[in-house]
UniProtKB/Swiss-Prot annotation:
The modification Phosphoserine is found at residues 972, 976, 979. It comes from Bos taurus (Bovine). Residues 960-987 are annotated as: Disordered. This is Voltage-gated delayed rectifier potassium channel KCNH1. The gene is KCNH1. Residues 93-145 form the PAC domain. Residues 922-962 are annotated as: CAD (involved in subunit assembly). Residues 1-220, 270-290, 369-377, 499-987 are cytoplasmic. Glycans are attached at residues 415, 433.
């Protein structure tokens, strides 16, 4: 007895895309590629393509859908580019292209490419079909044969192609048409709009097909049940009591009932049914064939209009023998003439054919599982069956009495008939009307006779028997015995063992409903989400439909070990026959493996593996289809015959799944655990080598596929172009980052001022361009001041007369620095050495740049531009300005002045007096040593400053997100070149 889920069938939404493509393709060779991953990797290839190309399915998985791995030296480059453009533009197109098989045999293919869309109208897959057209193309290699040679070559090619097609053709059952044409090519020619979509959808039915579990069909079945009982009651009554439908109302009612049953036959040709595997069959052809083979003939015979045939009989002739319509028909009649008896026989024949209508009870029998799902309905049906049996027995009991009351030999009434006794008891005896109609009249009415007959059969069936109506003749006694026997059986079966019947017949159903109630209570108690609850309920229904409530493990435990192993081999026979890895296994090895296999049933949407879970099982797909999802992209579609998991026999560690494996349809998987498989392989060493060599995983969950999405590539390209076209980032003068730089500069100036208090100021300032040299005892006519700095310099000459008498130095100073020379602090400056003097010079340079700092931001670009035009500039190195100004230390003793070498003003020349060489070398070494130490300290500080700046910029960016990007990242020019060097000099 089937339960509600089995009666309804498996109706959960499924992704039947792969099944639809395979069903439509027949002998077509095709591959499926992911349209959302770079290079469009292959996620599925059918057996036809594998045999045509020579590659195994595992070898072509994840390769490009353009089949670039099959290109060769003779493949046309333009066609390759057209194929790639078709993929990039998501178009439908077809090409003729020369490609190479795995053994490098060149073959001409006719390739058709079609995009597959999902429910969001987004292209997610590419369908590529391949047809071998080598026989219809020019020979690839030079062939000298002509004429009949070409014809022979063409014939040979066509013959081989037909042989391949016959090999690729699936096995068909006996009587099935083998020569099926592929519908996939026709679909591709019509366009991509009618291609199946890759999405979850409920089982679809054609518009003229009715679901057997819909509300309309359920209501119709209950109406048919009521009309069937109506037929089962009236047909025996009309046949037994020989009533003629002279009443037009009854004739119309019976005709309407016949029409309804004819309509039911038509509906049965358009109603789905549940297949042997629990699936809903909605194919019109299969529905028609199934109905014609089962109940069509019986339903047709039960719907013939027998009342209409009887209506055309001679009503007057028949009425002559009927007598009073309120009395019984033939029990009180004189024997009719011969021709009347013949007409009566024909009428009785058609009346007897009404019994065929009782075949309508077959509708109740085949739909009994629809009605017994409800306890009250079962009880009502049982009572109705008992009452219907009593009704039939009453009709037969009256027919016996009607036959026995008239004596054919003496033409008299038998007074030992139960009808005669009934007539005498109720005071309506039979009387012969000799002067009138010449017939027997009187007797009990039909209603009294039927009620009395039903009373007698009921008392006999229940074994009560009051005795007021008793059989008298031999035939009546025999029938009474039969009634008692049948009654005892019915009474004991229906009333005495109702509980036992329910327990035996509906034990699985009760267990099924008990389990469903427990699951519903559990889901309600723990408030499981609605979507997950529906998945759980659908899984339970589908699993029960497949197993019929039978506990396989419990049954196997009952059987002995040898028998259990044989059963397991039979249950896993599909895996052992389809995969070559098991061909060399011995019987003992197969039995050991079969004992370890488990059968798993999965509903649509179930996840077999989650990403990150341990892969501890090897799974073989027996039926259904699954998808492998990595990073929200479908990287593989698995179907019948595929294997996924991990190569346990080659890896020492337990793998983690790199992808999700989700069922698209109802799937049956045969699973073997890692430990169990390794145990068998360790024991059967010879088989282990063959198994590891021949078993090829369609998808290895241990390996992660590295790919780039086309959408990511496009987004990166757009961002790169956007950054390329963006304006330079500029900070406004009052920006917090700008203020932060000024604050760092002020702290540095304060630190330098503190260090300057204890050092000498009279040392050479190489970086600022001021060099102090001692004169020799030779008198000179004049002294020169040469300015070496980033701004344009102007040499200022002092005549000898204007210089003090005790002047021993020639000073190189900046313009306008006459009043900025050493003053009262000269004694402190004399104590300072090396790099301290350079720092002091830096401080003086800051004083010199007061004018530039006072300038507005509007005049800053012009001054910077003028400074950029200077011939002599300060570099980023720590070398002195002397070397940059071409004042070489090895030439200081020459008699010419430094203006001879100065690039500033060549026309103004001044004398340059030599200084002691050892003093300069000592100063330079000291400067070099201090520079190294300061550079290290500055590098450390700049590293920490950069980290702080990065954090500050991140905070400011988040706080000022409401501002425009141009305002946020706008950087203004520094206030002066010196401040810019102070901040960014170390970088």
């Amino acid at each position: 007895m089937t339960m509600a889920g089995g009666r309804k069938g498996l109706v959960a939404p499924q992704n039947t895309f792969l099944e639809n493509i395979v069903r439509r393709s027949n002998d077509t060779n095709f591959v499926l590629g992911n349209a959302q991953i770079v290079d469009w990797p292959i996620v599925y290839s059918n057996d036809g393509f594998c045999k045509l190309s020579g590659y195994h399915r595992a070898e072509v998985m994840q390769k490009s859908s353009t089949c670039s791995f099959m290109y060769g030296e003779l493949t046309d480059k333009d066609t390759i580019e057209k194929v790639r453009q078709t993929f990039e533009n998501y178009e439908m197109n077809s090409f003729e292209i020369l490609m190479y098989k795995k053994n490098r045999t060149p073959v001409w293919f006719f390739v058709k490419i079609a995009p597959i869309r999902n429910e969001q109208d987004k292209v997610v897959l590419f369908l590529c079909t391949f047809s071998d057209i080598t026989a219809f193309k020019q020979p690839i290699e030079d062939d000298s044969c002509k004429g009949w040679g070409k014809f022979a070559r063409l014939t040979r090619a066509l013959t081989s192609s037909r042989g391949v097609l016959q090999q690729l053709a699936p096995s068909v059952q006996k009587g099935e048409n083998v020569h099926k044409h592929s519908r996939l090519a026709e679909v591709l020619q019509l366009g991509s709009d009618i291609l199946p979509q890759y999405k979850q959808e409920a089982p679809k039915t054609p518009p003229h097909i009715i679901l057997h579990y819909c509300v309309f069909k359920t209501t119709w079945d209950w109406i048919i049940l009521i009309l069937t009982f109506y037929t089962a009651i009236l047909v025996p009554y009309n046949v037994s009591f020989k009533t003629r439908q002279n009443n037009v109302a009854w004739l119309v009612v019976d005709s309407i009932v016949d029409v309804i049953f004819l309509v039911d036959i038509v509906l049965n040709f358009h109603t789905t049914f549940v297949g042997p595997a629990g699936e809903v069959i909605s194919d019109p052809k299969l529905i028609r064939m199934n109905y014609l083979k089962t109940w069509f003939v019986i339903d047709l015979l039960s719907c013939l209009p027998y009342d209409v045939i009887n209506a055309f009989e001679n009503v007057d002739e028949v009425s002559a023998f009927m007598g009073d319509p309120g009395k019984i028909g033939f029990a009180d009649q004189i024997p009719p003439p011969l021709e009347g008896r013949e007409s009566q026989g024909i009428s009785s024949l058609f009346s007897s054919l009404k019994v065929v209508r009782l075949l309508r009870l077959g509708r109740v029998a085949r739909k009994l599982d629809h009605y017994i799902e409800y306890g009250a309905a079962v009880l009502v049906l049982l009572v109705c069956v008992f009452g219907l049996a009593a009704h039939w027995m009453a009709c037969i009991w009256y027919s016996i009495g009607d036959y026995e009351i008239f004596d054919e030999d003496t033409k008299t009434i038998r007074n030992n008939s139960w009808l005669y006794q009934l007539a005498m008891d109720i005071g309506t005896p039979y009387q012969f009307n000799g002067s009138g109609s010449g017939k027997w009249e009187g007797g009990p009415s039909k209603n009294s006779v039927y009620i009395s007959s039903l009373y007698f059969t009921m008392t006999s069936l229940t074994s009560v028997g009051f005795g007021n109506i008793a059989p008298s003749t031999d035939i009546e006694k025999i029938f009474a015995v039969a009634i008692m026997m049948i009654g005892s059986l019915l009474y004991a079966t229906i009333f005495g063992n109702v509980t036992t019947i329910f327990q035996q017949m509906y034990a699985n159903t009760n267990r099924y409903h008990e389990m469903l109630n427990s699951v519903r209570d559990f889901l309600k108690l723990y408030q499981v989400p609605k979507g997950l609850s529906e998945r759980v309920m659908d899984y339970i229904v589908s699993t029960w439909s497949m197993s019929r409530g039978i506990d396989t493990e419990k049954v196997l435990q009952i059987c002995p070990k040898d028998m259990r192993a044989d059963i397991c081999v039979h249950l896993n026979r599909k895996v052992f026959k389809e995969h070559p890895a098991f061909r060399l296994a011995s019987d003992g090895c197969l039995r050991a493996l079969a004992m370890e296999f488990q059968t798993v049933h999965c509903a649509p949407g179930d996840l077999i593996y989650h990403a990150g879970e341990s892969v501890d099982s090897l799974c073989f797909v027996v039926s259904g289809s699954l998808e492998v999802i990595q990073d929200d992209e479908v990287v593989a579609i698995l179907g019948k015959g595929d294997v996924f998991g991990d190569v346990f026999w080659k890896e020492a560690t337990l793998a983690q799944s790199c992808a999700n494996v989700r069922a698209l349809t109802y799937c049956d998987l045969h699973v073997i655990k890692r430990d169990a498989l390794q145990k068998v392989l360790e024991f059967y060493t010879a088989f282990s080598h063959s198994f590891s060599r021949n078993l090829i995983l369609t998808y290895n969950l241990r390996k992660r596929i590295v790919f780039r999405k086309i959408s990511d590539v496009k987004r990166e390209e757009e961002e790169r172009m956007k950054r390329k076209n963006e304006a330079p980032l500029i900070l406004p003068p009052d920006h917090p980052v700008r203020r932060l730089f000024q604050r760092f500069r002020q702290q540095k100036e304060a630190r330098l001022a503190a260090e300057r208090g204890g050092r000498d100021l009279d040392d050479l300032d190489v970086e600022k361009g001021s060099v102090l040299t001692e004169h020799s005892h030779h008198g000179l006519a004049k002294a020169s001041v040469v300015t070496v700095r980033e701004s344009p310099a102007t040499p200022v000459a002092f005549p000898a007369a204007a210089a003090p008498a005790g002047l021993d130095h020639a000073r190189l100073q900046a313009p306008g620095a006459e009043g900025l020379g050493p003053k009262a602090g000269g004694a402190d400056c004399a104590k300072r050495k090396g790099w301290a003097r350079f720092k002091d010079a830096c401080g003086q340079a800051e004083d010199w740049s007061k004018v530039s700092k006072a300038e507005s931001m509007e005049t800053l670009p012009e001054r910077t531009k003028a400074a950029g035009e200077a011939t002599l500039k300060k570099t980023d190195s720590c070398d002195s300005g002397i070397t940059k100004s071409d004042l070489r230390l090895d030439n200081v003793g020459e008699a010419r002045s430094p203006q001879d070498r100065s690039p500033i003003l060549a026309e103004v020349k001044h004398s340059f007096y030599p200084i002691p060489e050892q003093t300069l070398q000592a100063a330079v070494l000291e400067v070099k040593h201090e520079l190294k130490e300061d550079i290290k300290a500055l590098s450390t500080k700049m590293t920490s400053i950069e980290k702080q700046l990065s954090e500050i910029l991140r905070i400011l960016t988040s706080r000022r997100s409401s501002q425009s990007p141009q305002e946020l990242f706008e950087i203004s020019r520094p206030q002066s070149p010196e401040s810019e060097r102070d901040i960014f000099g170390a970088s």
